[in-house]
Every structure is written in structure tokens, then in C-alpha cells.
Regions:
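Intrinsically disordered, Lys/Arg-rich N-terminal extensions and targeting peptides
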Residues: 1-58, 66, 70-74
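Compact nucleic-acid interaction/catalytic patches
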Residues: 62
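Acidic helix/loop or adjacent segment enriched in Glu/Asp that either coordinates divalent metal
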Residues: 75-100
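Generic non-transmembrane alpha-helix signal with a bias for helix starts/N-cap capping motifs
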Residues: 91, 120-121
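Beta-rich strand-turn-strand
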Residues: 98-105, 116
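Acidic, metal-coordinating catalytic cores used for nucleic-acid/nucleotide bond scission
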Residues: 111-120
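Extended, alpha-helix-rich binding/interface surfaces that flank or overlap catalytic cores
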Residues: 124
């Protein structure tokens, strides 16, 4: 049988597939992981906001706390869940959960979203 040999170019494409797809910025991720603190991951869609406190592990990131803005509906919030007010309340819920689990600080991770003053991302912070 003939042994398959992968070229360097092919290997590089395999290693950085998520970068090529526009899903991961490895330079920013490395800077966040160097802090050795948990990350507050904020992801926004048109209708919802998701907040997670994530800790790095070699086997994969471990989610310590997860809060979704759809949980506001259970608490009586009848308004839209993708706006600034909902993001603020979701962030408040995440803060209370973090206090109950004795998490004092975290590093903000907004991913590939642009950092804009007054945005939903900072309302959740």
C-alpha cells in the first residue's frame, strides 16, 4: 500500500479551518486564555442574547454558567428579548448566578462582533 503524504499547504488549511470559515480569531482567543480567568462570552442574535461564563480546560471549554434571554419570559418579561433592556436584565441574571457560585471576575469575550459604544453587548456586561 502506498502511504499518503499530506503537503504543508493542506495541513495548514486543516489546522485553521475555523479561521477560514470566519468563526474564530485565534490571536484574540490566545490573549483571553493567557489571563487564566474565566471568560464572559456574550453572543447576540436578532431575537435573543446568550451569556455564558466559560473556563478553559485542555479537553475543551467548560461552561460554568449559562443564561439565555428567553428565560426572561418565565419571569414575566413580555417585551422583545433582543433589545438593550432585555440584554441588561439577562446580564443581571448572569451576575446573580455568578455571585452564587462565587465567581468574582471574568474577562469579556464578544467574539467577532464589533465593539460599539452603547450596543446590546455592553448592556449585557
Amino acid at each position: 500500500m502506498k502511504k499518503e503524504v499530506y503537503s504543508i499547504k493542506m495541513r495548514k488549511n486543516m489546522l485553521f479551518r475555523r479561521k477560514k470559515e470566519g468563526k474564530t480569531d485565534y490571536k484574540t482567543r490566545l490573549a483571553l486564555l493567557k489571563s487564566k480567568k474565566p471568560r464572559l462570552v456574550i453572543r447576540k442574535s436578532l431575537n435573543n442574547v446568550i451569556l455564558q461564563i466559560v473556563e478553559y480546560e485542555k479537553s475543551g471549554d467548560k461552561v460554568l454558567i449559562s443564561v439565555h434571554s428567553s428565560s426572561l419570559k418565565k419571569l414575566g418579561w413580555s417585551s422583545h428579548r433582543g433589545n438593550t433592556s432585555s440584554a441588561y436584565l439577562t446580564g443581571l441574571m448572569c451576575g446573580y448566578k455568578a455571585q452564587s457560585r462565587n465567581i468574582k471576575e471574568a474577562v469579556l469575550d464578544i467574539g467577532l462582533a464589533p465593539s460599539i459604544k452603547g450596543s446590546v453587548l455592553y448592556a449585557a456586561l
